[in-house]
C-alpha cells in the first residue's frame, strides 16, 4: 500500500470545436496484479465549502482503460531506439474513458491497460494505492507510449454532467 499525490493536468483546447482535450500518450498495465486507487481527500459532492466559507468546485479524475489484444504482438521502439515486441498490446479501438469523483475508488484488473491517473480541477488529489509488487520491473509494470496520443474530450467541468469521450 502506498500514497500517491496526483496534481491537476492541463487540458488542450481545440478552438474550432470549443472543447477541452486530454491527450493520452502512455498506457500501462500490471500483468499479474490488480491496482486500486482510493481518493482520500475528495468529496463526493460536485461543490464543497472551503476553509474560508467559499464554495469551490471539487476536482474529478479520469479513468481511461483498454483491454488487451490477446494472442497478438506489436513491434515498437524504445526511447533509445531499440526494437521491442509487446505481447498482448492494448486494443486502442476499444479504449474507454470515464469520469470518477470523490466517493468512488477504481480497481484496474490484472493486465488491464490504463492511463496514469488524470486529475482535472484546481487542486491535487491524494490516493491510497493498493497493489502487490514483487520488484521485477517487467512483471510489476509494462508501458506503451504513443507519439501523437489519443484525444479524450472532457466537457462539463465542474458540473454533475462532466463527461469524457473519445
Label every model-predicted segment.
Residues 144-152:
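Short, Lys/Arg-rich amphipathic alpha-helical interaction segments
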Residues 132-134, 152-157:
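Glycine-rich loops and low-complexity Gly/Arg-rich segments
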Amino acid at each position: 500500500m502506498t500514497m500517491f499525490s496526483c496534481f491537476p493536468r492541463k487540458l488542450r483546447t481545440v478552438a474550432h470545436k470549443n472543447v477541452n482535450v486530454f491527450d493520452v500518450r502512455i498506457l500501462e498495465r500490471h500483468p499479474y496484479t490488480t491496482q486500486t486507487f482510493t481518493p482520500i481527500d475528495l468529496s463526493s459532492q460536485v461543490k464543497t465549502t472551503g476553509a474560508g466559507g467559499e464554495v469551490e468546485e471539487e476536482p474529478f479524475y479520469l479513468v481511461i482503460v483498454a483491454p488487451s489484444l490477446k494472442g497478438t504482438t506489436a513491434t515498437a521502439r524504445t526511447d533509445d531506439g531499440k526494437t521491442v515486441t509487446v505481447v498482448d498490446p492494448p486494443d486502442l479501438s476499444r479504449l474507454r474513458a470515464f469520469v470518477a469523483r470523490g466517493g468512488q475508488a477504481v480497481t484496474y484488473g490484472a493486465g488491464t491497460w490504463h492511463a496514469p491517473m488524470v486529475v482535472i480541477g484546481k487542486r491535487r488529489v491524494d490516493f491510497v494505492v493498493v497493489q502487490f509488487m514483487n520488484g521485477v520491473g517487467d512483471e510489476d509494470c509494462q508501458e506503451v507510449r504513443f507519439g501523437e496520443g489519443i484525444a479524450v474530450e472532457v466537457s462539463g467541468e465542474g458540473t454533475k454532467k462532466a463527461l469524457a469521450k473519445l
